[in-house]
From Swiss-Prot:
Source species of the chain: Rickettsia prowazekii (strain Madrid E)
TM ranges: 6-26, 61-81, 83-103, 123-143
Subcellular location: Cell membrane
Protein name per the record: Protoporphyrinogen IX oxidase
Family, per entry: Belongs to the HemJ family.
One of the GO biological process terms: protoporphyrinogen IX biosynthetic process
Cofactor(s) annotated in UniProt: heme b
PANTHER family noted in UniProt: PROTOPORPHYRINOGEN IX OXIDASE, UPF0093 MEMBRANE PROTEIN SLR1790
Length: 145
């Protein structure tokens, strides 16, 4: 299994990049969606875009990120007691919660019941970027080792 470690590590990183792309892009779509009139052609188009991004890119990318991450943890050795790993996992937990919120907000748009402003979506769009920076620094620098 160790001989495949770099392949699994690559798959984990590719999956995480795809997931992050969705986490960063979906709130931007929501910014535009706040400007669309309910029931308009733009509203319908954005709903399709949001659904496909979530179902066909973000959800599979999140799942594969976890699968390959667990495989890597198994090969590399369980490091859960290391402080850097706990910080990384906290950042990942925030990303998972954010992913769930994005899914809920998509449903709100689909029902015509969005209550958030474009400013709100612009601000929350920073959450995945901050979590990504934390996770990358923890994995590469391991500042608490």
């Amino acid at each position: 299994m160790e001989s495949y470690y770099l392949w699994f590590k690559s798959a984990h990183l590719i999956s995480a990049i795809c997931w992050m792309a969705g986490l960063l892009y979906l709130p931007r779509i929501y910014v535009y969606h706040t400007k669309a009139k309910i029931g308009s052609e733009l509203d319908s188009t954005l709903q399709v875009m949001e659904l496909k991004l979530l179902r066909f890119i973000m959800n599979p990318a999140m799942i594969s990120t976890f699968i390959f991450g667990l495989i890597n943890a198994h090969i590399y050795g369980f490091v859960a007691l290391d402080t850097w790993f706990q910080f990384k996992m906290f950042a990942v937990l925030i990303l998972v919660i954010f992913h769930g919120l994005l899914a809920r907000w998509r449903k709100d748009f689909a029902k015509g019941k969005n209550v958030h402003s474009k400013k709100f979506y612009r601000i929350v769009n920073e959450i995945p970027a901050i979590c990504m920076v934390i996770a990358v620094i923890m994995v590469i620098v391991k500042p608490f080792d």
